[in-house]
Amino acid sequence: MKQWVLVKTFESLFAELTERAATRPEGSGTVAALDAGVHSQGKKILEEAGEVWIAAEHESDEALAEEISQLLYWTQVLMVGKGLKLEDVYRHL
């Protein structure tokens, strides 16, 4: 029997982060990341980008995928914090 795994998409992650920003659940790491501000978020993006590069050079594809997911998360946190929408970015793709 085939087991289905729930997959989060770029759009569903953005919706989840936007919801957390609006509802501000207590103890949320996303809320803390948003409250830390752009400087802190930018530093995390740089850190994660470096980890993506290192994983691509020296680690497994699974480790690389995990690092990319973290980079996407922090990029979206910054987007939400700055009030950007997905369409604002898609317009430039």
UniProtKB/Swiss-Prot annotation:
Belongs to the PRA-PH family. One of its GO terms (biological process) is L-histidine biosynthetic process. GO terms for cellular component: cytoplasm. Gene3D superfamilies: MazG-like (1.10.287.1080). It comes from Rhodococcus jostii (strain RHA1). One of its GO terms (molecular function) is ATP binding. It catalyses: 1-(5-phospho-beta-D-ribosyl)-ATP + H2O = 1-(5-phospho-beta-D-ribosyl)-5'-AMP + diphosphate + H(+). This is Phosphoribosyl-ATP pyrophosphatase. Its EC number is 3.6.1.31. Keywords: Amino-acid biosynthesis, ATP-binding, Cytoplasm, Histidine biosynthesis, Hydrolase, Nucleotide-binding.
